Amino acid sequence: MEEFKRYLDLDTSRQHDFLYPLIFQEYIYALAHDHSLTRSNSLELEKAGYDNNSSLLIVKRLITHLITQMDRQNHLSFLTNDSSQNPFFGHNTALYSQIILEGFVVVVEIPFSIRVISSLDLEGKERVKSHNFRSIHSVFPFLEDKFSHLIYVLDLLIPQSIHLEILIQTLRYWVKDASSLHLLRAFLHKYHNWKNLITPKKSSFSFSKRNKRFFFFFYNFHVYEYESILAFICNQSSHLQSKSYRPFLDRIYFYEKRDHFVEVFTKYFQAVLWSFNDPFMHYVRYQGKALLASKGTFLLMNKWNYYLVNFWQCYFYMWSQPGRIHINKLSNHYLELLGYLSSVGLNSSMVRNQMLENAFLIANASKKFDTTVPIIPLIRSFSKAKFCNLLGHPISKPIWTDLSDSDIIDRFGCIYRNISHYYSGSSQKMSLYRIKYIIKLSCARTLARKHKSTVRAFLKRVGLEFLEEFFLEDEFMFSLTFPKASYISGGLYRMRIWYLDIFCIHDLANHK
């Protein structure tokens, strides 16, 4: 990063093209290959004859030939639709073009990252550790604090299809480098030749998760534009002074949001600000979805629904079906949020009041944000991974019987601890106990099948401690976290605990 920063501090005569020379640096593609390409893509590179001595040279030759074709206005004719093998190079040009895109994203991320670091250094603020904001569980404390006081929620899917030229024009506000943007435009317009990279849709495209670094950067940038305008409207409609704020774009790549909006935004949105005078609007985004909750009326939520659909279509030229947005009442609707079923329910309590000789009961009702374990989807997932049947009855895992006993227990125990760890925030533990029972009995049946015995005979021979010692490791760590657990054990098992070290949800069937 220091090398990049010194390069960007050169004389201003070169700064308008400062990104373009970096595209030809070998360490950019080495960095992209080390951190971005998945294991499957690495295998594809090996099959295509990839090696450290020739790959970077081929990438440079591909860029040079691309520029030549652009100058001749031949529109990348060397990338054909019929074959991914190009006789000019003798290599998979689509694969190396993917490497160029990964390297381009690495280059474009540099000014964003340096801008964030420089702004923090100038203001004398301490850099916040990003991993504290990456946890999936960090969303739920906010929901507990805010959503229990709200009434309606807009459950919407963020459109992922965007017009190419709109994306390039938006990127121009941040990247003052015409040469790099022209190179990017040429690649994007030729993406229909490589169906493994994106899904074509006429003049627009849908982001693909196979090219992960490329996907995350442009998806975050696209959502950033949408959320910036949305935050601007919320601040203006509530008649509050717009303050500096620093939320992050995504929980994987963090770029600072800025509070400097173009003046045209103010003129453009003056006509719609009167419709959204609601100071109790809260917004949460997760996994391509978003929640927009309010204390307002159903009419206000309908206005937001109408505005969002037209905003995506008119400003970003994206078709958004009205059915992608649902208006629900929090009191009688469950939200499928990050593996939990969340709802806002009434928590009633009775208070006995004694005044002189008269005694009477007072009924109090308060709203509470509940998070429960979705037992049916979980059982369906365990059934698909062959841990139980569709009715939830545990079965053995035949594919693991070739492993050693310790490896089998280690795999089941890892799943057991991950489930216990992730669903520690559930307000109802009975469903979680059923899932734990499925894992334990499936482990016992797998071991019994390996030793050609029954579950009863196997456990009688090795003893229950053979499994309990391993599966109770999470409870042991829990007691270390709360030293007084023995005195309030009943209350602790009813508590919801959110962790800041959960970054992803792993597939049960894929153990690494």
UniProtKB/Swiss-Prot annotation:
Q: Which organism is it from?
A: Soldanella alpina (Alpine snowbell)
Q: Which gene encodes it?
A: matK
**Which InterPro entries would you find in this protein's record?**
Domain_X (IPR024937), Maturase_MatK (IPR002866), Maturase_MatK_N (IPR024942)
Instruction: Name its cellular compartments.
Output: Plastid, Chloroplast
Q: Keywords in UniProt for this one?
A: Chloroplast, mRNA processing, Plastid, RNA-binding, tRNA processing
- Mind listing the GO biological process terms from this record? mRNA processing; RNA splicing; tRNA processing
Q: Do the record's keywords include Plastid?
A: yes
Q: What GO cellular component entries does it have?
A: chloroplast
**Family of this protein:** Belongs to the intron maturase 2 family. MatK subfamily.
Q: Name one GO molecular function term.
A: RNA binding
Position of the signal peptide:
none
What the entry lists under Pfam families is as follows: Intron_maturas2, MatK_N
Protein's recorded name: Maturase K
Q: What does this protein do?
A: Usually encoded in the trnK tRNA gene intron. Probably assists in splicing its own and other chloroplast group II introns.
* Keyword Membrane recorded: no
Superkingdom of the source species: Eukaryota
